[in-house]
Amino acid sequence: MKTIIVFLSLLVLATKFGDAKEGVNQKQKKEVTQNEFREEYLNEMAAMSLVQQLEAIERALFENEAGRNSRQKRCNGENVPCGPNHSTCCSGLSCEETFGYGWWYASPYCVKPSKG
């Protein structure tokens, strides 16, 4: 019986002082959440600023590339069909009718020019 009274009194004291600290805990929770949201907001703003800077750099690079037309035209390598319907042969190769391919596929091929 004495132990039950002791436990009940502890329960009442814990409840009373727990409620007293609950207001303080709520204030602390509000401060923590406000700080977290503020930090998240600042981090988000920094990330957005970084994204905008990267987009500006990318836009400038693509404008320069489009303006100067820096992409090389593709060319055909050795033993690749060439002619009016195909792209041109790479440097060092010429578009010729060859015995090995031309008679079978009926189109000229890019080959190394013959020395002679």
From Swiss-Prot:
Localisation: Secreted
Entry annotated with the keyword Signal: yes
Keyword field: Cleavage on pair of basic residues, Disulfide bond, Ion channel impairing toxin, Knottin, Secreted, Signal, Toxin
Disulfide bonds: 75-90, 82-95, 89-110
GO CC entries: extracellular region
Propeptide boundaries: 21-74
Note on domains (UniProt): The presence of a 'disulfide through disulfide knot' structurally defines this protein as a knottin.
UniProt protein name: U16-barytoxin-Tl1b
Organism in which the protein naturally occurs: Trittame loki
